[in-house]
Amino acid sequence: MPIVDHNQAPEVPWRPGYRKWDVAGREQGASSTLSINTAEPGTGAPLHTHTMDELIVILDGTLEVQVDGVTHTVGKDHTLVIPPGCEHAFRVVGEENARLMVFFPTLDPYSNGQTRYLEGSRPDSVRA
């Protein structure tokens, strides 16, 4: 059973102003994916869908979240439960960076066929 020191987790190239560290996945023998993310105000994720659930735990900061066309402002100590096929996007609002924990019940959740971008482009590490 691997025990992962978050400070030793590899950083994955993502988006300008948005940093991502994979803390659990294939390298740890898991069949799911867990990452810690930090995002600066004004950054986030463009509108997209996944073929599987996504859980986003807001550890710090505030997000403006668009889910199936409805916009919500969601802060620290809340969890976004995003079912398969749900159109969603978010951006950090306010002056504080956001810190997020993101879970997928699969490996390679951003690969072709698993994630469809409706706006914007794929993150740097998963460009086709």
PLM features per residue range, with description:
Residues 19, 43, 51, 70, ...:
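A generic "binding-loop/recognition-motif" signal
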Residues 53-63, 68:
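Glycine- and acidic-residue-biased ligand/ion/polar-headgroup-sensing regions
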Residues 18, 34, 53:
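Short coil/loop residues immediately preceding or within conserved phosphate-binding loops
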Residues 34-49:
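Conserved short histidine dyad/triad with adjacent acidic residue
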Residues 34-37, 81, 95-112:
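A short hydrophobic beta-strand segment most commonly corresponding to one strand
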Residues 1-31, 115-128:
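A short, N-terminal "cap"/entry segment at the start of jelly-roll beta-barrel domains
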Residues 47, 65-66, 82, 88-95:
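Short beta-strand His + acidic residue motifs that chelate non-heme Fe in jelly-roll/DSBH
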Residues 69-84:
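Short acidic-glycine-tyrosine-enriched beta hairpin
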